[in-house]
Structure formats: structure tokens, C-alpha cells
Amino acid sequence: MKIVFSMRAWGQYLHWQNEPETLARVNGLIQECTRTPFTGTGKPEPLRGDLKGWWSRRITLQDRLVYRVTGTAPDQSLEIAQCRFHYDR
């Protein structure tokens, strides 16, 4: 599965380079999303409203990984919209 970051999500991902424990958590969640996008750690939950079709997983108490899976196998992509803060539109 291909992993695609939005520009904002990539900047947020780079922020975690200074916090190794959180970076390891983010990397683990991303890897898990590629295998089992809708179950697993981080309390995966579908989002509603303007973010319908996207899912979130908890990174820390205040930070979320927001993502969606697009395409069909073998051409699926994991699109990451954000990996810091709470849900932004």
C-alpha cells in the first residue's frame, strides 16, 4: 500500500522528529493502518460530518492521526491528512 501525506500532514510528521517516542508511535500507527486500516490500536473510529470517509487513531491524548484508504488492491493508498492536534477541517 502506498502512503501519501498531505503537505500539512508532512509538516506535522516532521515536527515529531524531535520527539522520538511520539514519532515511534506515529510510525507504528501508520504501519498498522497499511495492514488493518479499520481495526487495531489507537482506537480507530470513522469520522463524521465534513470528514466523512476519513478515520482517526489516537496518537496522544490531544493528537490524532487522520487518514483514509483509497483505491482497490493492489493499487490502494493510505492518505494521511494530519498527524498532530485534534480534528482540523
What is each model feature region?
Residues 2, 8-11, 15, 21-23, ...:
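Enriched for short, Lys/Arg-rich terminal
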Residues 2-3, 40:
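Residues that recognize and position ribonucleotide moieties
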Residues 4, 25, 46:
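Amphipathic alpha-helical recognition patches that constitute DNA-binding helices
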Residues 23-30:
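PIN-domain endoribonuclease scaffold, especially VapC-family toxins
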Residues 28, 38, 66-68:
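Low-complexity, intrinsically disordered short segments enriched for Gly/Pro and polybasic residues
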Residues 31-56:
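A short, surface-exposed loop/turn module that caps and links secondary-structure elements
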